[in-house]
Amino acid sequence: MLGFSYVKSAAAILCVGCLAHCLAFAGPPVASLGHTRLQGAWTSSESAVFRGIPYAQPPLGPLRWKPPQPIALQPGVRPAIQPAPSCLQAFVGWNRADEDRGSEDCLYLEIRTPRVSRKARLPVLVWIHGGANWGGSGGWVTDSGLADRGIVVVTVQYRLGVLGFLSHPQLTHESPHRASGNYGLMDQIAALEWVKRNIAAFGGDPASVTVAGHSAGGQDLGLLLLSPRARGLFTRAIQQSGTAGFGLPPRTLAENEKLGATFAAILGVPQDDMQIETLRAVEARKLLDAQMLLESPSLADNSFIFLQAVMDGWVVTGPPAELLRTGKSAPVPLMIGNAAQELLLYGGDSAARRAVARIFGPSMDQALSLYGLRDGTQPPDDPILGSTAMQVAADDTFRCPAEFTAAAHAAAGQPVWRFQMERAAPGQARIDHGSELTFIFDNRPLNIAVDGVRPLLQSYWVNFIQHGDPNGPGLPQWPAYGGKRAYLAFTQSGPEARTALRAPICALLQRP
């Protein structure tokens, strides 16, 4: 039986420990940015979260279609608890929540950190959300469990649709760089500059910043990797189901200016010297209605219209394919991958045949043979890659562009780790677009069958964010891409190292 003095001593120690814990979290977390103190909130896991942090002036009125402008925060305490609105966006079927809470005043970021201390110097992840540059937001990633594994997580809002990617001759003329059309990318660059200046106040290391993006976020990150404007702002990159160009033909500045003139005509704005000023005065929701009528002559599907890279000569200095081939990508470690069944192509094998003719051109016959479509028979579905139509769509838009990006980056002497997700997210029948996101970022409980997958994927991602290499103790080896074009397949039975993903098909495409 324990003596009374032992029990009393143990109780005293427990009380002291509890008191120290309570004192540590007695007040809200505060990050000091010069004369401004941002007041956040503690999470249930005792990390700190700061929301609604402006990184640029609201792009309203005369600042519509202008590069992001620096913002000076007022001295004193500023609450950073309420989420910022999503960037204004048209409803396109999957983004109702973000569309409902959208605002043109949206240039904010969120931060979740394990320690609010300048001495912590923790690695940083900056997340660029997807959504075809039409819609979406990234706040849900702020609530991921990565902060509980020693990562400072930052999510960025950026202008979307015509508000983020419109060119116009008058906009080009008023620019000191004679460029227009990449305001959404400029927002991302401004956010990265803000992170470099200020992340130490939140416990982050400005010399250890990884940028990750999914879908359009992966495409935008690919363009940032190629842009001299973003050079030196991050040290590692993770492109998930998105590459610079997405295999789509880029638009020249002149082509995007022509699209801008068409946009003004749709709105009935007079074609005069004040056209852009008149457009700046148009109610924002009317702009969104008009953007739904825009068409790009080089696209088979206009839902990709804001995924076509705009070669403005300032942010994007040339065709992404050429920039990649000539070694213009930033010299940083890269993780890049895709899901096995990224995209549906409606219409079955007949649609697949039409797509092959359009995509492969002079190599059409070879491609038809590789897909098993040449003799007019209907090939069986692949258990991992899905139907033939699904394979064609994913190869063209995701899988082969990721291969080309990995190969170009490796040829420039940079370390590359390539992956393909080959297991569905919980509750999903298909290994579709974003299948890996649930395992990496979602904090909700998973069923027993997939509980082991989350720590595995999170460990690979955390290791890469920390060290630029996903490998670590206790993990199956993930070989670098290198000359063998190695990749890791995340299968139903676990990770499998393989080589030369879809090599015969991708050799016929040869475009990023």
Regions inferred by a protein language model and the residue ranges of each:
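Substrate-gating cap/lid region and adjacent catalytic-acid/histidine neighborhood
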Residues: R236, A244-G245, T278-A281, R285-D451, ...
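Short, solvent-exposed turn/loop segments enriched in Gly/Ser/Thr/Pro and often Arg
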Residues: R159-G161, A212-A216, Q420-G427, P476-G482
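Bacterial N-terminal signal peptides that target proteins for export
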Residues: M1-A12
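Bacterial N-terminal signal peptides
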Residues: A10-H21
